[in-house]
């Protein structure tokens, strides 16, 4: 047993969650197992213990394996900064920023790093479960591919293809994928499974048999929709649980165009007393919101302009006048100040953009990136709690409101607060995962916390996910494919 790979017949078919569930199922069989994704595109990154960064989906998969996340689990991370360009992170460290067209010429040079990371994991674990990206059916991207069949063939890893029946056309998804693949690529596929079924699974029996007959591939089952998916950290901001439709205190988060590292929202959204509202472009900020969160952004100045285009700057000013609370995290913190300057053009064209002016601070973008886990003493609401979090940002922020810090990090003030304490900015991520801090923060908003352990809830959801896979799929057969 060495490795197997999960690929999708399309994007968003549920590969990440399937890999997490298979990792937990394999671990419960007594295997040492590690996740691996050759290439991920996401602005939702996790910081590793050695100061690198990987996709947050791989960090969740590592948790399913009982492991600390390491950079080898996701050697290539692409972090979009615009519609046509992205930052390229290789084995946890920023390599360059490139346009999509230019990345095609860079990809073949990255296969060495991908195989190096994969082989390190393979040498130290019984099983490596690999997740593809997008779909191998995008054959126009096959040249130089390192994410799907290019990797599978280079590493000789068998593939299970996943179709998403929820969006319709699953027969065409899977049979069509075989039809467009190069025969040598198609030979890497050992079987298929159907994901996200709703209703009576037996109603798809004929379709399931038809796929097997048309492709000659073995079927590993049809998986119903996992009802506890909302209890796992969201990979996409659109997947964040919105809480009950009625009841609960509203916390609103602005869905920025380059939203990044929004894992801070999951523990808040899981609180029964909170109704998390993701404010979409074109929508006003709910007047009943007790707290408005400005999340992280991969393009602070760009998202400041985007925010103003939605009229959210006007809504925020009105929210503050009504006595509402505002929390800016990372890029959101930078937006709250008087200005954001990027003299070297690190995130885009050089220049300075006026901020929202809700905090008396100013930010200057610098080339150095702070990427570290930290242990802090939270000063907000006088909690004085010791909490673990992480920082992942460029830029330095200074100003008078930093005299009222959100926390103390390594003996230094971190973050800033307005004189009335209602507007807060901080570079710290991950604090809301700490139950005591989350309770203290919510108490300051007049919200009673549930007292539930967020970490225990995620662990329970991973166990339930593994149980769900064991019930409906031939997990033993899937794991037996590994070679």
Curated annotation (Swiss-Prot):
InterPro entries linked to this entry: Class_I_gatase-like (IPR029062), CobQ/CobB/MinD/ParA_Nub-bd_dom (IPR002586), CobQ_GATase1 (IPR033949), CobQ_N (IPR047045), CobQ_synth (IPR004459), GATase_3 (IPR011698), P-loop_NTPase (IPR027417)
Higher taxonomy: Bacteria, Pseudomonadati, Pseudomonadota, Alphaproteobacteria, Rhodobacterales
NCBIfam families, per database record: cobQ, PRK00784.1
Keyword Signal assigned: no
Domain of life: Bacteria
Protein known as: Cobyric acid synthase
Catalytic residues (positions): 330, 429
Keyword Hydrolase on entry: no
Domain GATase cobBQ-type: 248-437
CDD domains (alphabetical): CobQ_N, GATase1_CobQ
Residue stretches spanning the membrane: none
Pathway(s) served: Cofactor biosynthesis; adenosylcobalamin biosynthesis
Purpose of the protein: Catalyzes amidations at positions B, D, E, and G on adenosylcobyrinic A,C-diamide. NH(2) groups are provided by glutamine, and one molecule of ATP is hydrogenolyzed for each amidation.
HAMAP family for this protein: CobQ (MF_00028)
GO biological process, one term: cobalamin biosynthetic process
Keywords recorded for this protein, A-Z: Cobalamin biosynthesis, Glutamine amidotransferase
Record family assignment: Belongs to the CobB/CobQ family. CobQ subfamily.
GO molecular function, one term: catalytic activity
